[in-house]
Regions:
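DUTPase catalytic domain/fold
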Residues: 1-145
Length: 145
């Protein structure tokens, strides 16, 4: 699958995979000066890229495992969604869960993009839902022994 992508700045780096079988494409910061993210603070970091995600797909913006586990930096909304009709700059709301300030520099890997198919659905309002063994059992209800 090919995705049309546009560099909005000369310094923007195209998404890149860390290995040939990686599902995620690394997204890189494109900032004119270093950005300091204080502990428990969120800052919007641009990538300098815009793209055309094909209809029937969305771009999921996920944390990079090492960046979140080792340094406490992750997308603030846990998973960002880039819809197929969005044409603006791809940005990452990066949150610092750590206890020390973190400096983000240009061309640094900040998140990963996974292109995911989805189904378009319609919702059918009903008065009653079908019964299941689980019923209305919610959080933790299936983990009990």
């Amino acid at each position: 699958m090919e995705i049309n992508i546009k560099r909005l700045t000369d310094s923007a780096k195209l998404p890149d995979r860390g290995s040939t079988l990686a599902a995620g494409y690394d997204l890189f910061a494109d900032v004119t000066e270093d950005v300091t993210i204080e502990p428990h603070e969120t800052k919007m970091i641009g990538t300098g890229l815009a793209m055309e995600i094909p209809v029937g797909y969305f771009g999921g913006i996920f944390a990079r495992s090492g960046l979140s586990a080792k340094e406490g930096l992750r997308p603030a909304n846990c998973v960002g969604v880039v819809d197929s009709d969005y044409r603006g700059e791809i940005k990452v709301a990066l949150h610092n869960d750590g206890e020390v300030a973190r400096v983000v520099t240009s061309a640094e890997k900040i998140a990963q993009l996974v292109v995911v198919p989805f189904l378009s659905v319609s919702f059918n309002e009903v008065d009653k839902l079908t019964d299941t063994d689980r019923g209305e059992g919610g959080f933790g209800s299936t983990g009990k022994h």
